[in-house]
Amino acid sequence: MKRKDLVKHLIENGCVLFREGGKYSVFQNPVNGKETPVTRHLELAEFAARKICKALEIPQP
C-alpha cells in the first residue's frame, strides 16, 4: 500500500498528524487518544497498514 493512501485513510477516519519524528510521522486518534508512528517509506506492507489501523482503532483500509 502506498503511504499517501494510508495517510488519506487515516485522515478520513478522523486521525490527525500529531508530530513529525526523525523517520516517522506520528498520527493520533483524538477520539480515544491512541497514537502510532507511520514510517516515511513510499510503500508500506499490507500487514503494517493493518497494524497501524488496529493501533488507532479505526477500520482497515
Language-model segments: what does each one mean?
Residues M1-K2, P61:
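Absolute protein N-terminus
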Residues K2-C15:
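Amphipathic alpha-helical segments
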Residues R3-K4, Y24, H41, I52:
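Hydrophobic alpha-helical segments, especially transmembrane helices
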Residues L6-K8, F27, L56:
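Intrinsically disordered and other compositionally biased segments
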Residues E12-N13, P30-P61:
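C-terminal structural segments of small proteins and small subunits
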Residues N13-N29:
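Major-groove DNA-recognition helix of helix-turn-helix-type DNA-binding domains
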